[in-house]
Amino acid sequence: MMKAFFIAGTDTDVGKTVASKAILHALAAKDLRTIGYKPVAAGSDKTPEGWRNSDALHLQKAATVAVDYEDINPYALELPASPHIAAKHEKVEIDYAVLSRKLAQHKENADVVLVEGAGGWRVPVSDTDSLSTWVKQEDLPVVLVVGIKLGCLSHALLTAEVIKADGLNLVGWVANRVNPGTEHYAEIIDMLEERLEVPKLGEIPYIPSAKRKDLGKYINADVLLEL
């Protein structure tokens, strides 16, 4: 069994890494070999080992297969901005062939590979292209992470619509409560369950420092494994 999924978000800061970690933890509980892959990350810190992005480091730690950082995050861009701006600032060209080569490598070594996106679905990686082009090229099934807050319904439904229009398979979604004060939470979830028309993998409650916690209990990984 080898499965790969792309983790998309309705926007930046909606909890893609939190949801990815939760899914990785749930899969680890089933004794599966997992790898978290962050092809492009904008916003990295200089370390003695080189540039490191905190989200990519969280994925590296949550996975069950040990992988060198450079293979988890081939493009660790310094500037915390849209990837196309950060890449231009550093005079870097994001090469889809590199992303595909790393993905193929991960597929050989894991039962499940989670590929975490950057920003939202149409995030630019150059002046003329978006990361979604590469996702379409790889024909990756998509899991949508919805940060539950005011405005998320429109963002979620629009993103799901575009993913499907791009010819990709939206296989599930995760609710991540990013604001503990969001009103009408249950009603928002009900609407998303009705309108997204794909399985909900789980609901992650608001948890301070969630990226540092074990989140597997909030995810039903069987939905992905049965695909």
UniProtKB/Swiss-Prot annotation:
Cofactor (UniProt): Mg(2+)
Record EC number: 6.3.3.3
Catalytic reactions of this protein: (7R,8S)-7,8-diammoniononanoate + CO2 + ATP = (4R,5S)-dethiobiotin + ADP + phosphate + 3 H(+)
Superkingdom field: Bacteria
Metal-binding is among the record's keywords: yes
Function statement: Catalyzes a mechanistically unusual reaction, the ATP-dependent insertion of CO2 between the N7 and N8 nitrogen atoms of 7,8-diaminopelargonic acid (DAPA, also called 7,8-diammoniononanoate) to form a ureido ring.
SUPFAM superfamilies assigned to the protein according to its UniProt record, in alphabetical order: P-loop containing nucleoside triphosphate hydrolases
Annotated binding of ATP, by residue: 13-18, 55, 116-119, 176-177, 205-207
Keyword tags: ATP-binding, Biotin biosynthesis, Cytoplasm, Ligase, Magnesium, Metal-binding, Nucleotide-binding
Compartment(s) where it occurs, according to its Swiss-Prot or TrEMBL record: Cytoplasm
Major site of localization recorded for this protein: cytoplasm
Transmembrane segments: none
Family per similarity comment: Belongs to the dethiobiotin synthetase family.
Cellular component GO terms, alphabetical: cytosol
Active site: residue positions: K38
Protein name stated in the entry: ATP-dependent dethiobiotin synthetase BioD
Subunit composition and interactions: Homodimer.
KW Nucleotide-binding (keyword) present: yes
Pfam families on file: AAA_26
Enzyme class: ligase
Known pathway: Cofactor biosynthesis; biotin biosynthesis; biotin from 7,8-diaminononanoate: step 1/2
MF-aspect GO terms: ATP binding; dethiobiotin synthase activity; magnesium ion binding
UniProt record, GO biological process: biotin biosynthetic process
Binding annotation for Mg(2+): T17, D55, E116
